[in-house]
Structure formats: C-alpha cells, structure tokens
Amino acid sequence: MSRYDEIYARAHNEPELFWEEAAESIHWYKRWDKVLDRSNPPFYRWFPGGTVNTCYNALDCHIDEKGHGDRLALIYDSPVTNKLQRFTYAELRQEVSLFAGALSKLGVEKGDRVLIYMPMIPQTIVAMLASARLGAIHSVVFGGFAAPELATRIDDATPKVIVAGSCGIEPGRIIQYKPLLDTAIDLADHKPQKCVILQREEQRAELIPGRDVDWGEAVASANAHECVPIASTDPVYILYTSGTTGVPKGIVRDSA
C-alpha cells in the first residue's frame, strides 16, 4: 500500500481520529470539547467548543512560533503588468495587521461581512487575511463581474464594507471596476456603510465623499490589529457559485 493509500484509508475508516491528529498541527486559543458533533445530522459540527483564528495560523504562527518571519510567504509575478513583488511572513503580517486596523476603524467587527471585489493582486490576499484577523467573514467576488451579478451578491452577503480595486488589467485593456461597483450598489437593496478603494496607478477612480475611503489613506492612519479568536464553527468566508443555473448560492466555510 502506498503512503497516499494508507492516509486515504485512515481518513475514511477513522475520520475523527484522523482529523483530531491533523488539528494538533494548528494553533488553538482553546481546545475543542469534542472532534465531531453528530447530534443534528446532516448538520455536523467539527471541533465545537474550540477557538481559533485563520489569519494567525496563516501568518503569525510562522513568525511567533516557528521563527520563519524572514521566509517568503507570497510571490506576486504578473505577466500583464510586468510587476514582481515578494513578501516575507513578517512583511505580509505588517500589511495585514495594518489593514485589519483600518477595517476595524471603519467599524468592522467579528461576524461582519466584508465583500472583496478586486483583481488577483497582493492586496486581495491582504484584505482576505485582514478580515479573518478580525473574525469578520469575507467574500471574494470575481473582479470585473457585471454590476447585476455583483448586486446579487451584495444583497445576499449584506457586507458592512466593500473593498475594491479601481481597475483590473487584462492583456491590451484596462477594466474600470469602480463604475461597475457604483452601479451594483445602486441596484442592490443593501447598501454598505463604506467602500475601501485601492487606487491603482493604471486607472484611478473617482471617490464618493462620505462613502468611499482611499486604501492608502486608511492604512496610513491605522494601528496594527491583533488576531481575534473565534469559534471553530464560526464562518471564515462565503464563496458563491457561478449562478449560471439560477441564483448564486453562498457556500459557507467554517474556521475549522
């Protein structure tokens, strides 16, 4: 039997023991009361009673517990913009903790939703991890989605804050995100309290006073924020289906 087959068989035959051992490799603020709660099928709950933070396990533990702060955590290599950026764990945590502080200053708390409408750039990862750092629930929507599709997801997720890029860049063209976002908010019944806009040098956007906040300015006035422990059964993100066969369905992912 190969190592893969052995691991697969064990996960299949002894799932609770298998995942209990796997859970030992991540950081817990409080250990779970039991591995799997089967009391309300088909709504099973993993590691009830435990508290955890996804951002801590993605970043902080590599620095504080393993001493890997100077190791590479993220490489951004864009053939479209010809930009190459590298972030160590320590550098990425600095970016994330400051943006978490900016979101907190805008009122984002544990359990709030943050919708992210951005291209595939480092700041998208920063926004995701910053939301998780606060115990907020993020939802990434494909950058450049048409306004009606974006509006549907805004109404479903009801975000307190939307984080968006001013534009996306594809071979031979620039797609302005901000007009799409503005139209989507007009179409949606739910209105976010604030929109944080990352102004990209290729195409800056016009900000709406009182609602829109410049990413750079928000971070410049923010203080770094620590991780917020949340229940292992609390959501960490919502990922929507394509909606090609009907209304998009939000898939909720628990923290553990």
Regions found by a protein language model. Name each.
Residues R133-E217:
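Structural core segment of the AMP-binding/adenylate-forming
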Residues E16, S97-G101, D155, G246:
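Solvent-exposed alpha-helix faces
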Residues M1-R86, E91-Q94, L98, I185, ...:
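N-lobe entry segment of adenylate-forming
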